[in-house]
Amino acid sequence: MSSFLDTRISRRHLMAAAGTSLLASGIPALAKTPPPSDVGRKFLRSRRPMPFAGNTFVGHLEQQGDGYDSFDRVLNIYRELPEQRFANRFALLPPSSYHVTLLGGVNESDRAHGPWPSDLTRDHALADINADYLSRVKARAAPPLGACRFLVNPTAAKTGANDNLLIPLKPADTQTAQRLEAARQSLMTLTRLQRPEYTNFQFHISLAYLCDTLDAAEQTAYRTAVRGWLTQLAAAGPITVPRFHFCTFDDMYAFRTLHEV
């Protein structure tokens, strides 16, 4: 006849065996969702911008004159976002920084292992790289790219739980696409830099960086809001970027224009 102690031990063994069986059956363990990719790189979770020095080639949206109407339409997102249920997850960019990137350049954060100019050592000071690039840009024989028209492309929107808020764009016509690609290829040669995003590049305007992962309800609301915003912008017509510049920056809030490209 089994003793009380034997019964307790047997039950303990059975529970342990059952736990082992559940683990072996492939029931997934709860995994912590990684934070958005730019947290700890460009922004803190508190939504404060981090130091993120570098250089780039961008075209800012024109805020006055012929560009006022399209800029004002983009600002509708800036106006409406604070009332959204997901708003506190995002770090809003100042409208003065709104731009379309033509070609990304060198970032200080890439110094250790990221993309770097093939003709420069990784201990080359960023200030010297900026000066070198500026000298090369000024010496180019090619005329400036000039104004480029873009169409808002709602079908390219990404509204996942860790996706930043941006306006996806595409060149308004074949001629504009060819001009943009020729300029990009020329600048790739100038910088002697190859970045992963150079291939299949998606033109866009960044509006806000996600600083915390969206939950399911927030993601649904985010997807719905972005779809509405982009549909309205697309229906309003092209967005024209009047000119592009070589720029330097210390963080994602402001870009110093140095020379038109």
PLM features per residue range, with description:
Residues 14-15, 100:
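An N-terminally biased module of ancient metal coordination in phosphate/nucleic-acid-related enzymes
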